[in-house]
């Protein structure tokens, strides 16, 4: 918990970009000047009223913020315990939380004179958000996406291309988010003069984890204000799904010093957290190491080689986690649990049936933990879960798992 060294859980990172022993910047000599230049530009922007005025205008008039805080009445009644609220970031322009951060980074890129934006993407939501903002500002956009994810997230691939982005399928490794990030970093090293790397999560070398967190914390700031208006007090528990952890950090950060609020992050348990490593639960089943420029919890073998991991959710299919989450885990301010594919699918179906909301598979993991937790809590206990993305992109994946033949115009089950 907070001690004399940390008067606030919100004080990190330090000047070297570290949260305790986590974070930092482990990058090549070629990239270090870029990283330092980005940090300098962001530090200037943070205290520049014109920067935040532009952000606020775009958040309001382009993204559609604030997103609603919605009382899920029928879901609450079905679960029979705590009151469940959803922070509806799936209603943002582009359908997820990702655009909150992309706007900030691309405004920074323009201030730095960069004309080419590169990004990595897993579920495709960060890629779509990046392509969207690049189209708005007339910037060249290149998105690296694992070949496996290109296949399972076809709707988002088409959206990116419609928006003018070049989508590059990455075939190395297992063709997922980790591999896409590797190739994006290689591109950045090669094209340092005109290129800005727009990272989609709270990972990577400093200042990315803190910068992305700051842009995403609009989620938690709004939720806190909206909850005070709705209930006259803070929530008892806040819950969010975690891949790299940007939507979760965005919800959690404004509540870190409110120690009465329980904070729970939900990792992707895949087929179960066991020695087979068919999951992406880095905190539940991993250990500290270095990947993509920062020290954090990772899935790795006994020799320190990074493992591929697995999840039904492309956006959670990452073998690491943001360093601030690793620190919050170690100091005990947040609790981290895992949810399996099948539990997430059950939550997906329940949300559709009770609330008329089709969630993405990523927040379905958070919702699955709500389904476990809420019935055990009193009716005056208040939960906020972050509905960080909509499920349009996942209908083909879900249909396959549920045995529904999408190619059949009659809409029959596959076994019929």
From Swiss-Prot:
Q: Which cofactor does it need?
A: pyridoxal 5'-phosphate
**Which keywords does UniProt give here?**
Amino-acid biosynthesis, Aromatic amino acid biosynthesis, Lyase, Pyridoxal phosphate, Tryptophan biosynthesis
Q: Name one GO cellular component term.
A: cytoplasm
| InterPro entries linked | Trp_synth_b_CS, Trp_synth_beta, Trp_synth_beta/beta-like, TrpB-like_PALP, TrpB-like_PALP_sf
Instruction: Check the record and name the SUPFAM superfamilies matching this protein.
Output: Tryptophan synthase beta subunit-like PLP-dependent enzymes (SSF53686)
Modified positions (N6-(pyridoxal phosphate)lysine) are 98
Keyword Metal-binding part of the UniProt annotation: no
GO terms for molecular function, please? tryptophan synthase activity
Oligomer and partners: Tetramer of two alpha and two beta chains.
The family annotation for this protein states: Belongs to the TrpB family.
What is the protein named? Tryptophan synthase beta chain
